[in-house]
Amino acid sequence: MERCRSGHHRIISYYLSSSLILFWCIFVLVLLSTTSTTNALVKIPKNTTVPAVIVFGDSIVDAGNNDDMITEARCDYAPYGIDFDGGVATGRFSNGKVPGDIVAEELGIKPNIPAYRNPNLKPEELLTGVTFASGGAGYVPLTTKIAVGGIPLPQQLIYFEEYIEKLKQMVGEKRTKFIIKNSLFVVICGSNDIANDFFTLPPVRLHYTVASFTALMADNARSFAQTLYGYGARRILVFGAPPIGCVPSQRTVAGGPTRDCVARFNDAAKLFNTKLSANIDVLSRTLQDPTIIYIDIYSPLLDLILNPHQYGFKVANKGCCGTGLIEVTALCNNYTASVCPIRSDYVFWDSFHPTEKAYRIIVAKLLDRYLNRFF
């Protein structure tokens, strides 16, 4: 803004009124904010624009939306964020960047996707994307209640509506529609439903079978994607569940003395993924628009876990934080838990969430496999 004023101030002021100067500066700011600000690693076709990355879901893509909440599902303290910019704990459930950040970086949009509820969020950040995701969220309403304070998906949509209104105030309705239509929407959810709801609460298993519960999850996921489509989104990635039975905490709790992957947890994840994939296919055919895509995250993460050395990892059955067996959120802290010296040796940061290195490998694979379906 200052550069706009200082370089040509005398000439501009001679020809234009101060109000027009202000308008011109705001226009330039908006233009720059909706143009790639980092070098794109993923090549997209010429004349194709991806102005923003907009994210919904759970702790995998939360960037700090829970930071001011009274909840166990928050991590705005060290050692979380030890490898993030400046070594700051922002509320990301990892040692560094999370998938939303990496997607935006790979597309050349910006280095990080900020949390929508960050009180220090700059207005121009809205133009290039935010995350509404919240640790503890799930497709089944009960799941978020278990987290005591997480933001359920319906509330994430309410924040999204608020976000749209803010965009309209900044750039007008026409530009807002363009941003929503051409942005990449990322939805990652489902792990908490299976691990923290179905397999943790006996009353849930009295009411549902694994088949009926995963069907409920898949139906709610389809409804969520359809709602985003109704808001004008046309590039929607809906991620399936990961191999939950192979994350360190679940191996510790239910994997027996040898901490094996828990087959029934993985089977539930695969069943959900099958139902979700079918639901997304039906939705795409119903809308006659193939711009809602199911993303298989199960296979690439499982490959890292089963074949860590092929990707430069040394440890895949424990997290880097503490003993690596059970530490997550409050148990992963600077007072009672040490941190492994070489984070890049580990697939998992804590007992539930991967390291930035693991996320980077997975995101690169997924973008290479799926992104061209939009263009």
From Swiss-Prot:
- Primary subcellular site in the record, as a coarse category: secreted
User: Pfam families annotated for this entry?
Assistant: Lipase_GDSL
Q: Which GO terms describe its cellular component?
A: extracellular region
Q: Which residues are glycosylated?
A: 47, 334
Q: Please give the CDD domains that the UniProt record associates with this protein.
A: SGNH_plant_lipase_like (cd01837)
Q: Has the keyword Signal been applied to this entry?
A: yes
The free-text tissue note of the record is: Flower buds.
Superkingdom of this entry's organism?
Eukaryota
Q: What class of enzyme is it?
A: hydrolase
Key words, A-Z: Glycoprotein, Hydrolase, Lipid degradation, Lipid metabolism, Secreted, Signal
What PROSITE patterns would the database entry show? LIPASE_GDSL_SER
Active-site residues (renumbered): 59 (nucleophile), 350, 353
Q: Which GO terms describe its biological process?
A: lipid catabolic process
Query: Which EC numbers characterise this protein's activity in its record?
Result: 3.1.1.-
Q: Which PANTHER family match?
A: GDSL ESTERASE/LIPASE EXL3, GDSL ESTERASE_LIPASE EXL1
This protein is called GDSL esterase/lipase EXL1
Q: Which organism is it from?
A: Arabidopsis thaliana
